[in-house]
């Protein structure tokens, strides 16, 4: 259940600000 928004393709994935 990830929050909406764009995510980086790095690992671990982090929400982009």
Curated annotation (Swiss-Prot):
Among the GO biological process terms of this entry, one is:
killing of cells of another organism
Please give the name of this protein.
Ranacyclin-E
Task: Write down which residues bear the modification named Lysine amide.
Answer: 17
| Cellular component terms per the entry's GO annotation | extracellular region
What family does the Swiss-Prot or TrEMBL record give for this protein?
A: Belongs to the frog skin active peptide (FSAP) family. Brevinin subfamily.
User: InterPro entries attached here?
Assistant: Frog_antimicrobial_Ranidae
Kindly state the tissue distribution recorded for this protein.
Expressed by the skin granular glands.
The UniProt keywords, alphabetically, are: Amidation, Amphibian defense peptide, Antibiotic, Antimicrobial, Cytolysis, Disulfide bond, Fungicide, Hemolysis, Secreted
UniProt key word Nucleotide-binding: no
| Acetylation found in the keyword field | no
- Cysteines joined through disulfide linkages: 6-16
Which compartments is it annotated to reside in? Secreted
Q: Which Pfam families match?
A: Antimicrobial23
Q: What is the stated purpose of this protein? A: Has antibacterial activity against Gram-positive bacteria B.megaterium Bm11, S.lentus and M.luteus, Gram-negative bacteria Y.pseudotuberculosis YP III and P.syringae pv tabaci, and antifungal activity against C.tropicalis, C.guiller-mondii and P.nicotianae spores. Has hemolytic activity. The mature peptide inserts into the hydrophobic core of the bacterial cell membrane and increases permeability without disrupting membrane integrity. Probably binds to the outer membrane surface before aggregating to form transmembrane pores.
Question: Native species of this protein?
Answer: Pelophylax lessonae
